């Protein structure tokens, strides 16, 4: 695990351009409206030696990809630069950056000693002609240079939006390869942007629905090893797994951790009925939460652990319901035209994301916990299985193409419905689960 040394003293908020008064802070407010991306420049970081040169260029590249990929920032290409940054401590030529309308400037330096790498950076308010603080430093191994890029991007994002970033995070997903009728599915994990893919299982059995723990060190998933679906739990660091729930004559699936990581919600099918259960991981004891003749599945906790949202067909079609985490009476919250499923609570607690099937199309949507303010963010032949970014501002999901190949791929979209983007994976991908920010 890479160890980070951090020191940060940030000053006044980033200020707007020439047309804005210097005592008014610039802040990107993320809402449902149209956002004009903030123009910024991120020149290659300055290396202290030839050994650091490649890292310096790559760190700036990944940093820019993070910020621009969020849809909130617009990178000014290096071909437009008037000034070049050749020294970390050289005075900034603010007039040159103003001339190309760079409202923010990010400069940095990279040093390498053996397998140790140190990154320093500064965030500048170009139009105010001021440095925002005394600098930030991350240190780790050369193998962890991408994480340091994401850390810098998170710091910039947080400073300008006032909210935490999401770049230094990972995604567990199901890697899919082979023809549609002989699809091989493996559990995999990667950086949020598709880099550093690691396969955690082979393709000897089908795997489904991976779900990260609140600490990001464990993953729940469903495996058909042995012929029946069983819930497994895997330690990501050790790549060690064990069966968490196994009972003859039953099928268990759709697992989800509680916010404290001590309990697992899941669906259990037995005797022709499917209900929700909660298992204490330490003791292995399970408590039945529902007892209806309908199918209850896809449960998800509220961030405070007090309530559960889930999918049920008790009304005749799949709809969304909310109930106490201890079970009891459930309240229906979905009333639009169509079928609803795969609900998941935002880490902010304000929204629930879901899959909706209506009029021959599939959608990813969001609504309030009481079912109000429903909004559909996407529409396609098949969109399903949303998962939230750590800051609750972006949703990743599975999109499957129509046709004989039926290739599944991962996409992301922000909660305003803007910035729909594919997430690159080596093969097809489905069932994403976003981790919390890494420590």
Swiss-Prot record:
Compartments (UniProt record): Periplasm
Gene Ontology cellular component terms for the protein in this record: periplasmic space
Single biological process term from Gene Ontology: cell division
Signal peptide: 1-21
Region feature (Disordered): 420-439
Keywords: Cell cycle, Cell division, Periplasm, Signal
SUPFAM superfamilies per UniProt: TolB, N-terminal domain, Tricorn protease N-terminal domain
UniProt xrefs under InterPro entries: 6-blade_b-propeller_TolB-like, PD40, Tol-Pal_TolB, TolB_N
Taxonomy, superkingdom: Bacteria
Assembly description: The Tol-Pal system is composed of five core proteins: the inner membrane proteins TolA, TolQ and TolR, the periplasmic protein TolB and the outer membrane protein Pal. They form a network linking the inner and outer membranes and the peptidoglycan layer.
Described purpose of this protein according to its UniProt entry: Part of the Tol-Pal system, which plays a role in outer membrane invagination during cell division and is important for maintaining outer membrane integrity.
Family: Belongs to the TolB family.
Protein name per Swiss-Prot or TrEMBL: Tol-Pal system protein TolB
């Amino acid at each position: 695990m890479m160890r980070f040394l951090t020191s940060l003293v940030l000053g006044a908020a980033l200020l707007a351009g020439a047309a804005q008064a210097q005592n008014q802070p610039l802040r990107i407010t993320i809402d449902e409206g149209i956002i004009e991306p903030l123009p910024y420049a991120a020149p290659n970081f300055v290396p202290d030696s030839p050994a650091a040169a490649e890292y310096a260029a790559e760190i700036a590249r990944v940093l820019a990809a993070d910020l621009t990929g969020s849809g909130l920032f617009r990178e000014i290409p290096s071909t437009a630069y008037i000034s070049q940054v050749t020294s970390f401590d050289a005075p900034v030529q603010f007039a040159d950056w103003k001339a190309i309308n760079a409202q923010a400037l990010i400069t940095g330096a990279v040093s390498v000693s053996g397998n140790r790498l140190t990154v320093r950076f500064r965030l500048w308010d170009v139009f105010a002609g001021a440095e925002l603080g005394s600098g930030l430093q991350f240190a780790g191994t050369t193998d962890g240079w991408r994480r340091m890029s994401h850390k810098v991007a998170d710091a910039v994002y947080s400073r300008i939006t006032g909210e935490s970033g999401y770049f230094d995070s990972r995604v567990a997903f199901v890697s899919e390869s082979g023809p549609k009728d002989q699809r091989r599915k493996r559990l995999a994990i990667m950086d949020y942007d598709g880099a550093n893919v690691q396969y955690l299982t082979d393709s000897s059995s089908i795997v489904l629905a991976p779900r990260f723990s609140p600490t990001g060190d464990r993953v729940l998933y469903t495996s058909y090893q042995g012929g029946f679906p069983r819930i497994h739990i895997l330690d990501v660091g050790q790549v060690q797994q064990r069966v968490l729930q196994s009972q003859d004559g039953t099928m268990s699936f759709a697992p989800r951790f509680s916010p404290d990581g001590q309990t697992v919600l899941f669906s259990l099918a037995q005797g022709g009925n499917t209900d929700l259960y909660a298992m204490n991981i330490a003791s292995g004891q399970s408590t039945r939460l529902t007892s209806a003749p309908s199918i209850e599945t896809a449960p998800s906790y509220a961030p405070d652990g007090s309530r559960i949202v889930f999918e049920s067909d008790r009304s005749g079609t799949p709809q969304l319901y909310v109930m106490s985490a201890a079970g009891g009476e459930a309240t229906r919250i979905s009333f639009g035209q169509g079928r609803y499923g795969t609900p998941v609570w935002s880490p902010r607690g304000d929204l629930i994301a879901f899959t909706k099937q209506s009029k021959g199309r599939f959608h990813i949507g969001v609504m309030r916990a009481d079912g109000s303010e429903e909004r559909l963010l996407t529409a396609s032949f098949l969109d399903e299985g949303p998962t939230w970014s750590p800051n609750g501002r972006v949703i990743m999901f599975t999109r499957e193409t129509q046709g004989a190949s039926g290739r599944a791929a991962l996409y992301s979209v922000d909660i305003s419905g803007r910035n729909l983007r594919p997430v690159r994976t080596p093969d097809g991908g489905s069932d994403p689960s976003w981790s919390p920010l890494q420590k």
